[in-house]
């Protein structure tokens, strides 16, 4: 694994986005970055210091593409979502802090891949953001649980994995939410795993469900319109630009 490999992967992704824009006439935004699971796997074969150095080079390369407008966000970055040794966990947090500092310096958002340990995960991330001088709203928790209350998220932005029962939980916590949030499917487009994780049609389906749940909860048509416009248009433009 070399920085040239990352450059090739990034440019392949950018080219795919260009082809889709030209063929279908739709807006496609690109997120680039080295995945934290890749870091955890590679350090066992390449070495912790050597691969951490390469990982940071890959982050800086992604930031260069963002600065030229070819990508809109750095990600997924973060830390392993599964148990690791204390040494690796500490190194992963130190690495994430350095990545956040680079993002803060570049004034860009990051999409974060982390473990699901409830409010503690958000608390940890918020402290890292503050230490790195990265505004919390520029740290976007990917594959987030449906509790979007600010007390739970600590002011981080979230994209909720909208599986079954997610909409009820979103509506329940919405009155206590003062942060940016959105919907996601984590769709893989893997021919060997059709539909994984959730298919693209899930978003309009869940949007309709959200509309109905908000009506049942007493929200007015204007309030519902504002919520839907924010999560599907206004806030993505703020976070991914």
PLM features: what roles do these ranges have?
Residues 116-119:
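Gly/Ser/Thr-rich loops at beta-strand to alpha-helix junctions
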Residues 1-106, 112, 122-134, 141-149, ...:
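Mid-domain alpha/beta scaffold segments of enzyme catalytic cores
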């Amino acid at each position: 694994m070399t920085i040239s490999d990352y450059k090739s992967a990034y440019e392949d992704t950018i080219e795919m986005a260009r082809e889709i824009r030209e063929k279908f006439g739709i807006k496609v935004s690109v997120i680039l970055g080295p995945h934290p699971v890749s870091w955890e796997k590679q350090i066992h074969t390449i070495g912790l210091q050597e691969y951490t150095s390469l990982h940071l080079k890959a982050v800086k390369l992604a930031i260069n593409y963002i600065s030229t407008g070819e990508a809109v966000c750095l990600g997924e970055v973060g830390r392993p979502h599964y148990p690791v040794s204390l040494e690796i966990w500490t190194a992963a947090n130190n690495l994430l802090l350095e990545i956040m500092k680079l993002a803060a310096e570049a004034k860009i958002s990051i999409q974060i891949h982390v473990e699901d340990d409830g409010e503690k995960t958000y608390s940890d991330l918020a402290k890292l953001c503050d230490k790195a001088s990265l505004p919390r709203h520029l740290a976007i928790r990917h594959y987030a649980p449906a509790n979007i209350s600010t007390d739970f998220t600590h002011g981080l932005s979230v994209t909720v994995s909208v599986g079954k029962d997610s909409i009820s939980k979103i509506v329940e916590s919405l009155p206590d939410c003062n942060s940016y949030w959105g919907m996601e499917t984590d769709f893989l487009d893997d021919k060997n795993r059709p539909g994984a994780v959730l298919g693209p049609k899930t978003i309009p389906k869940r949007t309709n469900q959200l509309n109905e749940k908000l009506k049942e909860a007493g929200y007015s048509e204007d309030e519902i319109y504002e919520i839907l416009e924010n999560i599907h248009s206004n806030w993505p433009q703020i976070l991914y630009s």
